[in-house]
């Protein structure tokens, strides 16, 4: 998993509440088990008209938001089914963090497990962030738990264990590999 310490990127506001995992990545695209390739179908029903013709009315298709890597959204983001593919699609598209009012618990944990930082903020802060220029870089300072913008700095909470995992780029396998020597010694001893 890629380390997440201090990240700078532009943002795109998709301010709907209750964006569910089927809207994030529809079920017809869930056949693969490799984490790559899902970004093309992120928000498929909203991004495309038919045959992958871009919907000019969907914000991600606006040229000024094409390189955005921070998603700002409303409450209850990632609700619905427990598909981990939703986090894969957001990451594969290029998002490194999501700033929303709240998340479904399963999506929140899936995002963290895949190196995608879900940040919770109150509606007042979300409304301020949507007023930023599409060209303004927002800084996410994970060690200090800050969102840094021209409008001010906004603190966010994160479980210290997840914070450490993200800063060190450690997923569950990476953590297990830290104990590889001890595991091997145990296996040798107990054969």
Curated annotation (Swiss-Prot):
Could you mention a single GO BP entry for this protein? L-leucine biosynthetic process
Residues forming coiled coils: none
Q: Name one GO molecular function term.
A: 3-isopropylmalate dehydratase activity
Known catalytic reactions: (2R,3S)-3-isopropylmalate = (2S)-2-isopropylmalate
Q: Name one GO cellular component term.
A: 3-isopropylmalate dehydratase complex
Record InterPro entries: 3-IsopropMal_deHydase_ssu, Aconitase/3IPM_dehydase_swvl, AconitaseA/IPMdHydase_ssu_swvl, IPMI_Swivel, LeuD
User: Gene3D superfamilies from the entry?
Assistant: Aconitase, domain 4 (3.20.19.10)
Name the enzyme's class: lyase
Pathway assignment: Amino-acid biosynthesis; L-leucine biosynthesis; L-leucine from 3-methyl-2-oxobutanoate: step 2/4
Cross-referenced PANTHER family:
3-ISOPROPYLMALATE DEHYDRATASE SMALL SUBUNIT (PTHR43345:SF5), 3-ISOPROPYLMALATE DEHYDRATASE SMALL SUBUNIT 2-RELATED-RELATED (PTHR43345)
The protein's role, per its UniProt record: Catalyzes the isomerization between 2-isopropylmalate and 3-isopropylmalate, via the formation of 2-isopropylmaleate.
Note the subunit structure: Heterodimer of LeuC and LeuD.
What the record says about family reads: Belongs to the LeuD family. LeuD type 1 subfamily.
* Name recorded for this polypeptide: 3-isopropylmalate dehydratase small subunit
């Amino acid at each position: 998993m890629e380390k997440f310490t201090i990240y700078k990127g532009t943002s795109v506001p998709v301010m709907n509440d209750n964006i569910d995992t089927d809207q994030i990545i529809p079920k017809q695209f869930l056949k693969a088990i490799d984490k790559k390739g899902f970004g093309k179908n992120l928000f498929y029903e909203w991004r495309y008209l038919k045959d992958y013709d871009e919907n000019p009315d969907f914000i991600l298709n606006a040229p000024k938001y094409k390189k955005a890597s921070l998603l700002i959204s409303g409450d209850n983001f990632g609700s619905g089914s427990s598909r981990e593919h939703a986090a894969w699609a957001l990451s594969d598209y290029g998002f490194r963090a999501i700033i929303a009012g709240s998340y479904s618990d399963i999506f929140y944990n899936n995002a963290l497990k895949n190196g995608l930082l879900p940040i919770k903020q109150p509606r007042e802060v979300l409304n301020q962030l949507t007023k930023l220029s599409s060209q303004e870089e927002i800084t996410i300072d994970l060690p200090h738990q800050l969102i840094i913008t021209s409008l001010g700095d906004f603190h966010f909470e994160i479980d210290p264990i997840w914070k450490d995992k993200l800063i060190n780029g450690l997923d569950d396998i990476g953590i297990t590999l830290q104990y590889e020597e001890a595991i091997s010694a145990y296996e040798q001893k107990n054969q």
